[in-house]
Amino acid sequence: MRRFVLIFVLLILPFQFSWAAAARYCQHEKATATWHLGHHEHRHQQPEGKTDAEKKPFVDTDCGVCHLVSLPFVYGQTQDVLIANRVEVTDTQHSSEFSSLNARAPDRPQWQRLA
């Protein structure tokens, strides 16, 4: 049974990876002849009356759900780019030596029968 499951996973996983990669290319196509492997009609479902300013500044990831949720998480979604690009520099120079270092060799046992 384990062999059957392993063979099944080894056959399905590459197909799923290629399907998810192809899904990124077919999103939001406007052409009339857009049928190919993995293509589906994309419908935005949002409430009426929202302006462009009220829309979320995220990548549309609901297509990835249709394609087994593989690739949309590769594209990191951040709301504020300035916060995401902030890098804190730390001082890598140590000003003091480590005080816990004991450079001596370990002592030999003082008992005759354990030596």
UniProtKB/Swiss-Prot annotation:
Induction: By zinc, cobalt and cadmium (zinc being the best and cadmium being the worst inducer).
Protein origin, superkingdom: Bacteria
Extent of the signal sequence: 1-20
Biased composition regions of type Polar residues, renumbered to the chain: 93-102
Cited function: Component of the czc cation-efflux system that confers resistance to cobalt, zinc and cadmium. May have a regulatory function.
Keyword annotations of the record: Cadmium resistance, Cobalt, Periplasm, Plasmid, Signal, Zinc
Localization of this protein: Periplasm
GO CC term (a single one): periplasmic space
Signal among keywords: yes
Organism of origin: Cupriavidus metallidurans (strain ATCC 43123 / DSM 2839 / NBRC 102507 / CH34)
Transmembrane parts of this sequence: none
GO biological process, one term: response to cadmium ion
Ribonucleoprotein is among the record's keywords: no
Ranges where the record places region Disordered: 93-115
Protein name: Cobalt-zinc-cadmium resistance protein CzcI
